[in-house]
Each structure stands twice: as structure tokens, then as C-alpha cells.
């Protein structure tokens, strides 16, 4: 019994984490308030502003209860470290106790990441196949231009497993490049078919890229034009079996597949139209067509009635016409009279720029009646062997399909046909939504990058001393109830005079304090470490502290404090006076030990400087 965890499960897990960074309740509440105010006016409800506020409050309460939002922060901690961190409760709490500063993270700081593979000539790339585990296929490539922008392509056809020798073109709408209707790029040299997916700007890549991955564009999550044009179509039709030279009676002229023909269709320049008529001399619609051919040397035409039905008359402007009847009408066997089913005018067939071929008809079933049908035709080589299936229209709204080669009576009546193994075709259906509609699912993106910057130019990020750890925390609590976009968590003691000579960075500030409780008066030592000390040049010194700790309340009181080289040192500085602890001591806003640490890392001490910026990047790979 097989048990398989699909790539969808991994992607869904990634989606859930990504979506948890997206907070929309405030927008929903605001939109509701706007709609309520409009309805109040148009329906003459006479609700006061206060009543509308109360009603909106009900909605906000329900949103908070039924759709709780998460807040994420990347925080820096610990000016030094005694050991490498480990995944233990002690280490996580030690990080939370020693938080120094942090930034709030939103969905703008998060990117889906995908594996980037640079296109390399001579590589055999996998083409999309709905019977294969697509997460294991090497079918996505990256092309990088001179500006450093990255263009992502998906292989739809690989020329029956041939090597790719021509890079997909990044130009949209240019002849031989990306078709602006389908966003497919067809290589005329190696017969590869590529689907343009999206591009990644150089600036985005510089911020989020890793050694082997690039970020999905935000907020479009792909290319909006490609996504809107995507259809649930036939991706390709594979030939799983076909007899050699099956269509030898249908090879006219040179009978070769030219490398300069981007459609990969049979070149047969000697097929021309001798005459085009309607049902009557005055009928403008084409009906009866006389085709002049040059038979391949040594070959012959089948003179039987309707021998060339079940073929298409192909026209180089992307049209095919079903041949209803056929008759070989000349003694030399170079003329075929056919009737076709079309609403096109006779004039459209006499355009001098038109070229024509007779090609095998491929019939593809439909999943639903409302979708556009797939119109496909066969490509034969100079021997008349079916080698490829090409398309006029790949159709839409396909979930499942079968494909069948329609045989002209002249082919099926040939000697020895009954002993041949029948041609077998397999229709490959595009993913749900169509190629390019959902890059996250199509590329099995189960990796997220979370980015923030700590800059010395930011007002709330310290521009001195060190930090040795960073972590991503979910739902930390702040003392004042806010959710700041950035915070400095250092405690600050303001004292009179210039005390910078006493407040030595790295030393400890201690104070013995008395506490009254149910067991009488108890004492504790409040200890913190000096992060920096700044004299304002006139009256006061601000002493910035980290690692504030004590047995009970962890707060300084009005009175003297002392600076020591270590907390237990007998030797202390001259006393420094806190005149009014209520006003002169300010503690960090982050409530210690709150928030769930999802990821944390330690490193050698990083020095904070005013002209320095550190980029912090977490990669989550599911």
C-alpha cells in the first residue's frame, strides 16, 4: 500500500505560514464602516456616528475572535554569548530575556522562493507531463539579461527528449520569441517549446536570493498578464507508438521538416491552389478547391474516391480546414479536387502570401462543452512517418482528454495496414488553472524567505555595541499594548551631570532594593549591563542598559546605583544617584519571555555602527 505526501501538502504548509504574515482585519473593518455609512445614508437609517462605531465594534470583535491575526518580529539579542545556542527552553528564554531591539515583519518582507536553474546549452530538460511527479522534473530554467533581471521559463515540449541548444527568448511579441497571446516561446532550431512564467528584478534578487533560489515577484505572485492569459489547455500530445511511413502517400514535394519553420510543420512548397470556387459562381464563401501537387519521386497518388479525407488543409496563417471529399482529377495525378467546411471567403484563399499543406488530422476529445476545443494536426517526416503533433488552438477548460489520429481511407486501405500496430497518442493536460496561472503550486514552492534590515540610521536601532543572536518571534507582547514597527528595548536611566567616565560600557549597574510583601521586607539586587552612555553636553547623562534582572521586580528605585566590573565585584564606582525613578528610569517596551520563537541563530558578535546595515534573512524550507 503506497502512502504519498504530495507536493501540494508541502506547498499548503508554506501557504499557511505565508498567509499568517498577511493581516487584513483592519482593512475589512474599515471597508465595513464605509459600506455601513453609505447604506445608512442611502436607506435613511438615521444611525448616529456613535451607533455606527458600536456596530463596527461588533464586527471587529468577531474578526478578532474568528479570524485572529498574528504579528511577527525579528529581534536582536545578547551583546555576548557563553556558548552556541541549542533548541532548549533555557536557551529560548535566555534569548527573550536579553532582547535589545527588533523590527516588525509583514508580508512585504516575506517571499516565496523557488529553485533557480540557469539554462545551459546541450541539456536535456524534462517537459511537463501530467503522469509524472512534477516536483522531480527539471523543467524550469532561468535566463538572466545584462541588467541582472531573471526570466523564468517552463519546458512544455522537449523535442522527444532531445537536447536544448537555443535559449528561450525573453522578448515578448517579437517574431520567433514569446507569443503575447499564449506566452509560449518556440525554438525553431531545437524544437523546444517554453512557457514564459514571470521575471524577477535584479533589485528583488539582490535582497532575497540565495545561492540556489530566487524570490517569486510580490505582490503579483507571478506575472499578472501571464496569469490572466492562462488556460486549462492541452499541453502537448505525445506519440507513444506509430508505424513507420504510415503517411507515405501523403508526402508531397521535398517532404522534410525544416529547421527554419517555427511551427515545426511539414514543408511542402509545391502544394498550390489551382482554383477556389463556391457552391455557385456568385457565392463568396470558399467551398471547392483544386490542389496542385508535385508527387515525391517514386511515390504515387491514391486515385480512390475520398482517399484524402480525414486530412486537414493547412494554411500558414494558423488555419486548418477539414477535407470533406476528395477526388484525384487529372490523368497525371497531380491535381486533387477537395471540398472543405469553412465560412472563409474565396478571396482569403487567393491571397498571394498564403501557403498550403495537407497534414494529418488529430482529434482531441473535450472535457466540457463550454470550453474551446483543441485543434491539433500531425507533422510527418520525409518518409511519411508521424513525428510530432502541433496545434492551431490548444483549447480551454480541459481536465482530461484523449487524442486519436484520424486516418484517410487511402492510408487505412493500404496493403499490410491491418498488421501494423496502431498509432497511439496521449494527451497531456495542463495543470489546474493552466500553465503560469499559479507559480507557487506549479513550481512546488515550499520555501519562504523572511527578511529585515537593522540599520544604524534608524532611530530605534542602537548604533553601538554588539549583538550575537537573532530570532523570528510570533505574537510577542508589548507593555503598552501597541504593535510597534520597530523598537529599542534597552532600559534608560537619566542621571544628572556627565557620568560617562563612570558608566563604562560592558560593566554592570547594581542596586540593592527593599521590597515589602506578605512575608515582610525582603531585599534584592537589581542588575543590568551598560550598553552605552551618552552625555547631552549640558546637564544629563543617559545610561542605556541591557540584561536587566533581579529576583523579584527587576526595577530600579530612587537612590544610588553603582557600576561594577562584574555583578559580584566588591569594588564599585562612586555612587550615581537616581533622583526620581518614576521619571528617570524607562524600561524596554517588549515584555520579556513573550512570543513564540520560530527560528533563532547565533553568530560571532556583530558590531552596530551608525553607517552599517545588516540584512537578516531566515529561510524556511518545508
Residue ranges, per PLM feature:
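Conserved, function-critical positions that sit in or immediately flank catalytic
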Residues: 190-622
Amino acid at each position: 500500500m503506497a502512502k504519498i505526501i504530495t507536493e501540494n501538502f508541502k506547498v499548503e504548509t508554506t501557504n499557511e505560514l505565508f498567509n499568517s504574515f498577511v493581516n487584513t482585519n483592519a482593512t475589512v473593518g474599515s471597508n465595513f464602516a464605509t459600506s455601513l455609512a453609505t447604506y445608512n445614508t442611502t436607506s435613511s437609517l438615521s444611525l448616529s456616528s456613535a451607533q455606527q462605531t458600536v456596530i463596527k465594534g461588533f464586527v471587529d470583535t468577531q474578526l478578532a475572535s474568528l479570524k485572529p491575526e498574528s504579528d511577527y518580529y525579528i529581534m536582536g539579542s545578547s551583546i555576548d554569548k557563553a556558548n552556541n545556542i541549542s533548541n532548549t527552553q533555557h536557551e529560548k528564554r535566555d534569548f527573550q530575556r536579553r532582547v535589545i531591539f527588533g523590527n516588525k515583519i509583514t508580508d512585504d518582507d516575506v517571499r516565496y522562493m523557488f529553485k533557480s536553474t540557469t539554462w545551459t546549452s546541450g541539456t536535456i530538460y524534462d517537459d511537463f507531463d501530467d503522469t509524472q511527479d512534477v516536483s522531480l522534473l527539471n523543467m524550469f530554467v532561468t535566463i538572466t539579461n545584462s541588467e541582472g533581471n531573471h526570466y523564468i521559463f517552463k519546458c512544455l515540449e522537449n523535442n522527444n527528449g532531445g537536447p536544448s541548444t537555443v535559449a528561450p527568448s525573453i522578448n515578448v511579441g517579437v517574431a520567433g520569441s514569446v507569443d503575447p497571446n499564449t506566452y509560449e516561446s518556440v525554438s525553431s532550431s531545437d524544437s523546444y517549446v517554453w512557457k514564459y512564467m514571470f521575471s524577477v528584478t535584479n533589485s528583488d534578487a539582490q535582497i532575497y536570493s540565495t545561492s540556489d533560489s530566487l524570490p517569486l515577484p510580490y505582490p503579483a505572485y507571478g506575472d499578472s498578464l501571464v496569469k490572466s492569459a492562462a488556460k486549462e489547455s492541452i499541453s502537448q500530445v505525445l506519440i507513444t507508438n506509430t508505424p513507420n511511413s504510415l503517411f507515405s502517400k501523403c508526402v508531397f514535394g521535398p517532404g522534410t521538416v525544416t529547421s527554419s519553420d517555427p511551427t515545426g510543420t511539414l514543408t511542402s512548397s509545391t502544394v498550390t491552389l489551382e482554383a477556389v470556387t463556391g457552391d455557385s459562381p456568385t457565392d463568396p464563401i470558399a467551398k471547392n478547391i483544386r490542389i496542385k501537387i508535385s508527387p515525391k519521386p517514386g511515390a504515387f497518388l491514391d486515385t480512390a474516391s475520398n482517399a484524402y479525407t480525414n486530412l486537414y488543409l493547412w494554411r500558414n496563417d494558423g488555419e486548418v480546414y477539414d477535407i470533406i471529399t476528395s477526388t484525384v482529377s487529372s490523368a497525371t495525378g497531380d491535381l486533387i479536387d477537395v471540398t472543405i467546411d469553412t465560412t472563409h471567403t474565396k478571396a482569403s484563399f487567393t491571397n498571394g502570401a498564403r501557403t498550403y499543406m495537407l497534414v494529418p488530422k488529430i482529434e482531441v476529445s473535450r472535457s466540457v462543452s463550454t470550453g474551446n476545443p483543441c485543434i491539433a494536426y500531425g507533422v510527418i517526416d520525409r518518409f511519411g512517418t508521424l513525428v510530432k503533433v502541433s496545434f492551431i488552438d490548444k483549447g480551454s477548460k480541459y481536465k482530461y482528454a484523449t487524442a486519436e489520429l484520424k486516418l484517410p481511407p487511402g492510408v487505412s486501405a493500404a496493403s499490410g495496414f491491418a498488421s501494423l500496430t496502431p498509432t497511439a497518442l496521449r494527451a497531456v493536460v495542463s495543470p489546474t488553472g493552466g500553465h503560469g496561472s499559479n507559480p507557487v503550486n506549479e513550481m512546488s514552492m515550499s520555501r519562504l524567505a523572511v527578511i529585515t534590515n537593522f540599520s544604524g540610521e534608524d532611530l530605534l536601532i542602537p548604533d553601538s555595541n554588539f549583538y550575537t543572536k537573532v530570532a523570528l518571534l510570533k505574537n510577542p507582547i508589548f507593555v503598552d499594548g501597541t504593535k510597534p514597527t520597530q523598537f529599542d528595548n534597552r532600559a534608560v536611566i537619566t542621571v544628572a551631570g556627565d557620568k560617562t567616565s563612570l558608566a563604562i560600557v560592558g560593566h554592570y549597574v547594581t542596586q540593592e532594593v527593599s521590597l515589602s510583601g506578605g512575608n515582610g521586607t525582603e531585599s534584592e539586587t537589581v542588575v543590568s549591563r551598560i550598553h552605552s552612555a551618552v552625555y547631552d553636553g549640558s546637564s544629563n547623562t543617559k545610561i542605556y542598559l541591557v540584561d536587566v534582572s533581579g529576583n523579584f521586580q527587576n526595577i530600579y528605585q530612587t537612590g544610588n546605583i553603582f557600576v561594577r566590573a562584574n555583578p559580584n565585584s566588591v569594588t564599585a564606582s562612586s555612587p550615581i544617584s537616581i533622583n526620581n525613578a518614576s521619571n528617570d528610569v524607562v524600561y524596554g517596551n517588549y515584555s520579556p519571555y513573550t512570543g513564540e520563537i520560530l527560528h533563532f541563530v547565533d553568530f560571532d558578535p556583530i558590531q552596530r555602527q551608525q553607517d552599517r546595515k545588516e540584512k537578516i534573512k531566515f529561510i524556511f524550507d518545508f
